[in-house]
Structure formats: C-alpha cells, structure tokens
C-alpha cells in the first residue's frame, strides 16, 4: 500500500492527475498531496513532463523526511540512555568534601555505570565551579567535560602508586581544599575501588585525621564496601604515616641489591598440580628492569619434591620496587593457539628507602603478598624470601621528593569536613570495625561456653596501628594480621635513624604494647563481699572425690570452720580451678541479700554448685540435717543466695569465667550430660517435674537418701528427669521419649522445658517421702524397657535432638556445628569457601565455584560458561550438553567461546583479568580433551 507522505509516491500521483484532469486539477492535487491508485500506460509520458518542474521537490521531500526520522531516532536513544543511568550513579561522599566514583565514560558502555554528562550535571548542580576531578586510571577522556579541571595521574593497574606520586597528589588536593571552603575533590579510577581508596586513605593521613592506617581503612570500608586494598596498598599507607609523623621519618637514597629470591614450599600451578615453571620480573615503578624468562624448554620446572624455588637475581634497585613471579606454560598441544602463556604466582611491592641499612633478608608470608587469590595453589606456610644488601653510598636522584622540607604540623584535619559534627561522626565511624572485614579473632566465644573460654594458645593483644608504622620490614613478636606487612631478619633495635615500616626510630612515639590490665572486678549480683586474694597458682593437683562431694553440698572441705567462711575457696567446677587456663579472682557473697530478680545471661539464674553463704560455725551438711523449708534449702531457692559465678558472655567488658557445670547452655536442651538440675540433685524420684519451690522438703539424715529409689518402679515408669534451670545431668539411662503420664497428680511436660511448677500436692504420692524408706545404694542405672521407650512417639520425639545436643559446644569455637538445621557451614569445603569469601575478590571466587567439580572437563565448562561471564556480555549464547555430544560440536562451541573470552579482546577493560582466567580454564580443558583423543560423549 502506497504511503501518501512518501515523496516518490507523491510525484507519481502528480503525473497521473495531470494526464487525467488537466493543468488546473494537477495543481489542486499537488497542493493537497493526493495520489491516484490507477496508472495507465497511455499516460506514461506525463512522468517525464513532471520531472522538469518536480525534480527539485522530489529530493527536497526526501531530505526533510530523512532528517525528521534521524532526529526522532536520536531523541529516543538519548531518552532510553538517560532513563537507564538516572538515579543509578556510582557516586559516594566519603566526606562532604571528598567524593569517590567510578570511571565516567563518554559513550554508552555496559561495563560502566557513570556517564560523563550525568556526572557533570550532578556536580554542576551541587558544586558549580567548586570541584576538581582526579583521574587515577591510565584511561582518559575529554577534560572539557568537567570544565578542564581534571588532573591526569595515570596510576598503574593492580599495583600501588609510587610514593612520590601519592604524596604529591595528596598535597595538591590539600591546596585545592584550602583555597575555598566550598571546594570539593572528586576521585575516580576505573572501578572506584583500590586506587581511589588508597588516595583517600592517604589523604586522611596527610591531613592528620588519623596517624595509623587502620582507622582510615575501616572508614573506607564503611563508606565504600569492597574496596579491595592489597597488602601493598596497606604497606604504602604505613609509609605515609611515617612521613607525616610528629617526628617524620625520611627514606634514605641508598641503592638495594637483590641477590636472590627463594620461594618455599613450591606452589601448584602446572596441570598436574605438583609444581610450576617459574620466572621472575623486577620493576621499578612501571619500568621492567630485569626478567629471568627465557626459552620455555630451557627453563627449569620445580616439583613439590624440590621443597623450594631458588632464583638468583643480582639486580640493584632503588625507590618503588616490584617483584613479580609467574608460572610459564605452553599451549603447543592446542591446535587453536600455539604460544606460551603465563600466570602470576604472586607480586610484592615495597620502597627501598624504608629498609634498614643492616638488613640482609626480607621475608613475606602469604597474607603479605599480592595476587595470591587461589588458596588451593599455595601450600601451607608459603613464604617468599629476598636476600638483599643495602649499599653504603647514597645515589644521586634527579627529582627532589615532595616530602622534603614539607611541614605538616599546621595541617588541620577539619579541612576535610564542612562541620564539626561531621568531623566527630567520621572519627567515631573510623573506630568501628566494618562488617565485611574478616575478624581479627575468628574464634567466637559461645554464650556460657566453657571450652570456648579456655586459652588453648597464648592470645596476644592486637598491635595498634601506631606501632605498625614501620612493621612492614622487621620481624614482629605478635600474631600476624593483614596490616602487618613485612618481616625481616634484622634485629628490632637499631641505633641509626633509618628504619623500616614498623621499626623503632629515634624520637618516634612507639613502644611495645603493655600487658593488658587485669579484668575489672564487677559485682554483677550485688553481693559486695570482701575481696579475696587466693593464690590460684598454688593448686598442684586436682581435688579428690571427697572434696568434690564436699563442695557439691555447699561445704568447702574438712579442714575447719575457718575455711567454711572463706569466700575465695576454689570451686572445682569453676574455671579458676585446676582445669582452667585463666585465673580470675572472684567475689563471693557474705550474706544472702542479693537481689532476687537479677539475671545475668540466660543461664545464670541458678547455680547448684555455688557455695551458699553461711556463718563460720555452720555444719557442712546442715542444709540436709535440719528441717527443710523454702528458706533454708539452696536448691529450692535459687535466688536466695545466687552463685557468684556467671557466664562469660553476660557482659563483654568484664572478664568473668564461666561455670563449667551450668555454663554449657545445657539448661535449654534435653538430655544434658550434667548434674545441675533440681531433679537430679535434690529429688530425682519426686514429681515428674521436681520439687516445687514453695513446698517444704521432708527431713532426712542421709543426704544420699534421694538416690536410693533410683531403681524403684516409680522411677522406671517415667522418662528421663527433665533438666532444670541450671542445665542438669539426668540419670544415666538410654534416651527416652517424653510421654504424658499422670504422676503425683500432675501432667508431665516434655523434657528440656524451662519449667517451674505451681502445684502444691505432687509430693504426697512420692514413695521416698517417708523417712522409713532405706536408701538403696546398689541402684542399677539400667535402660528403660523397650515397650516403655516406644510410648512417646505420638507426642514428641526428642531422641534425635537429644543426641545432637549432647556435645554441641565442645568444638563450637573451631567451626563445628552439631545441628544440621542451623545456618552455617557444615563441611570443611563450605568452611573453606566462607574463609575465601572474606579475602578473595568476588569475581575470582565465582571462577572457583564455576570450575569446582569440572576441572579440565570441556563439556561441563562450556555448558555452564554463561554463569560466569561478566555483566553485559551478550555475544555468548548458552549451550546444553545435548549440543556437545560429538567432538566436532565441542570444537565448534569451544572456538566460539574463545572468541568471546579471549584476553586480547578485553585489553584495557576492567574485566581483562577475569576474561583471562576463564580463557585459561577453557584452554586447559581443551588440551585435556585433545590428549584423551577427543572422544564422543556416548
């Protein structure tokens, strides 16, 4: 159907109208733009008559219509791009005057979120004529987009910037902020992560906001999570702290000779995962000055049996030194590519001016090395050693360092903020540990967990960041962390002024961390007794059985009444006794005036093993010989004289040892392996729930009379005694299921409930309530009859839970978990993944998850490759296993995959390293596929 608006159709219509209706009708048709659907051959000559006067109009209409179409299409594209980026800018205010963002691009690029026009509009709307941009990436753009206020720094990728450049940029930023209180600095690199973060962190140190790298890094993690600072970045932040200290340290200019490099043990980078073929590159800044890479066949391949890698270097360096080691492998077996490729094993970077003059060895452990992102390829105790020698003569330098003759005493940190309140909030935020940082102490003390509180090894206090200013190059006596960067074999003390990161320099306020103060004695239960200074180290042997029983029933031994009134007698169930690795003096009550409503922790309401307060002359077994009442039985009045021992988790600021019997959190679980419940300690054969707290206890002269009826029929007709408030030890019998049975006029509750009965008559039917009953000490703790154990299946099945909860807290601090239904890692592999996720880049972790179980399986990798491609990749279409049956199909799909992920096509892109890793895994799998003869799937 002809479009009446088309220029060609309009001209044809004009010719037909002129031939049919004459000159006047032709003019009317021309003005109206009408067209006739009928064209007869006899009137064809009219077309040629029209050309003379209508040719100009023909091309004019074509031009106008084309212009309108292009304008409409362009406006639609611009609107779609604006809607895509609007409100989705990668833009972070670290402070009100320091801004971090990702790279702004001129055109539409899927890999970048920020468009130059959007960023410029945003900055002009808020900081017009008061902002300058610092481009840290080697990639550039038109500076006119930001009014020509762009500083091109061109920092290298995947390494720390030179110390000279880092200091100079910080000084430039400070001068810009000093010119006008409204000025702001906008910092960006390719992704707005590592390079931008080290500059902002160095700026915090430059402005004297922080004197150590730790708070600066924590603030960056809080403001912009996932910054991904490498050990070299942290090392250079430490250098900045030394340069800007109260008594600044000035790096020397003496050359450094690297004699050799030793790596031990041998990492696993070859296809067999039993060695590597290494070579080493040495760079000064971005310039490579030495490499040991030669012909592939002439290079030595080290195996695990060799124990270490030794490569002589004998190269002299000065300034920012980078040492990188690579594994060389050949892809000659591949038909697609016949060339040699490399994989980085590690990289380290340091400044030679911070090496002490008498240093001969530099040692780097795995946490102090860059690019160690695949833990499976590095054996345990992996370390790198550099044999070095510092030359005695200074080397003449061309450029004067920017820190020479620069005084930072007048620098005010308030220049980074717009208000005093913002300054205080930022300082508080820098003192908090970020959520995504790995904890310094991964061992988590469970609530009331006894074994979790034991000192299995010496715990050393975490070194402050101030003491870490030069710790990068000396051996430290403390535990290693991510911020301790280098260790040396040189002695700690040196009389000369040249010191490394962490070394002790003259005039530097630095000293060894003092011993932690003794834990504050806090009277959590309001006992306010007299202080006791018992020498816990004098306990030479564990107490005997008689001493255990004496302490169990409230006594302190048989040595005399003088010890009975002493509050600091060692309780064998307390960690300060012989079984504890820590000794903490305790306060014990001298009166029964504790608050009856005080609850410290969840399980501290009742401690059956705590010694009750009593006069010095009181009989040890007086609570069992006199007439029982609710006011005299410590087992029936848990709040009358509470135990001074509470859970360690009740308050984190006080070091209080947990109770070994009541602190295992067994008071909330059935089948606890203990003796702390009311039922087990006082009346195991009473009511099905134990003795009510308001009922008087029958008088007896035998404290063990309650144990005499353990084998009676009444005991055999009910399930295991439920655990009481203290987390008790039920009678030793097979695990039974709770079943409702009428016993003593009450209804039995399932075992393990936190219970307190209010009934007043359940003890009238107890068979042992009569004093004439003789205790039976020959009781047999036999299992419940089979028929009895099957009764409770209809109500509550607790057998499985009972077994699972018995030893739940024994190994909780080591990452083991007894409950399968709880969240968290249940296998070693999951725990390893959880640790890897804390330190590893998410993209590289995604690669590991992709190849897990599919190593060198070309079909499995190709069929799942769509799950690991970077965002925005649309060329690759997912394939199924049905498309990879024959070798020809595999070859075709593999070639198509290589065209998508080849590293040469990703040069300069942020996903270049990511594409390289995918390509190498596919290449390994293809080589394995060829070596196996390219067999079909079936």
From Swiss-Prot:
Instruction: Give me the sequence repeat coordinates as residue ranges.
Output: 61-64, 65-68, 69-72
Query: Annotated Gene Ontology MF terms?
Result: clathrin binding; clathrin heavy chain binding; heat shock protein binding; protein tyrosine phosphatase activity; SH3 domain binding
**Where is region (3 X 4 AA approximate tandem repeats) located?**
61-72
List, alphabetically, the CDD domains matched: DnaJ, PTP_auxilin_N
Ranges for the C2 tensin-type domain?
253-391
Domain J residues, every copy? 874-938
Name the residue ranges with Polar residues bias. 531-548, 579-596, 624-654, 754-781
Please name one Pfam family that this protein belongs to. Answer: PTEN_C2
Q: Where is the Phosphatase tensin-type domain?
A: 80-247
Gene Ontology biological process terms in this record: clathrin coat disassembly; clathrin-dependent endocytosis; intracellular transport; regulation of clathrin coat assembly; regulation of clathrin-dependent endocytosis; synaptic vesicle recycling; synaptic vesicle uncoating
The EC number(s) this enzyme carries: 3.1.3.-
Q: Which residues form the active site?
A: 189 (phosphocysteine intermediate)
Q: Where in the cell is it found?
A: Cytoplasmic vesicle, Clathrin-coated vesicle
**Keywords carried by this UniProt record:** Chaperone, Cytoplasmic vesicle, Hydrolase, Phosphoprotein, Protein phosphatase, Repeat, SH3-binding
Chain segments carrying region Disordered? 19-41, 467-801
Where do Low complexity bias regions lie? 559-569, 679-694
GO cellular component labels: clathrin-coated vesicle; extrinsic component of presynaptic endocytic zone membrane; postsynaptic density; synapse
Gene inactivation phenotype reads:
Mice have a high rate of early postnatal mortality, although surviving pups have a normal life span despite decreased body weight. Knockout animals have impaired synaptic vesicle recycling, with an increased number of clathrin-coated vesicles, and impaired clathrin-mediated endocytosis of synaptic vesicles in neuronal culture. There is an up-regulation of Gak, but this does not fully compensate for the lack of the protein.
Q: Which residues cross the membrane?
A: none
Q: What class of enzyme is it?
A: hydrolase
Per the annotation, the residue ranges of the short sequence motif SH3-binding are 434-442
Q: Describe its assembly.
A: Forms a complex composed of HSPA8, CLTC and DNAJC6. Interacts with HSPA8/HSC70 in an ATP-dependent manner; this interaction stimulates the HSPA8's ATPase activity. Interacts with CLTC; this interaction produces a local change in heavy-chain contacts, creating a detectable global distortion of the clathrin coat. Interacts with AP2A2. Interacts with DNM1(GTP-bound form); this interaction allows clathrin-coated vesicle (CCV) formation at the plasma membrane.
UniProt note: domains:
The J domain mediates interaction with HSPA8/HSC70 and is required for basket dissociation.
Q: What does this protein do?
A: May act as a protein phosphatase and/or a lipid phosphatase. Co-chaperone that recruits HSPA8/HSC70 to clathrin-coated vesicles (CCVs) and promotes the ATP-dependent dissociation of clathrin from CCVs and participates in clathrin-mediated endocytosis of synaptic vesicles and their recycling and also in intracellular trafficking. Firstly, binds tightly to the clathrin cages, at a ratio of one DNAJC6 per clathrin triskelion.
Q: What is this protein called?
A: Auxilin
- Classification lineage: Eukaryota, Metazoa, Chordata, Craniata, Vertebrata
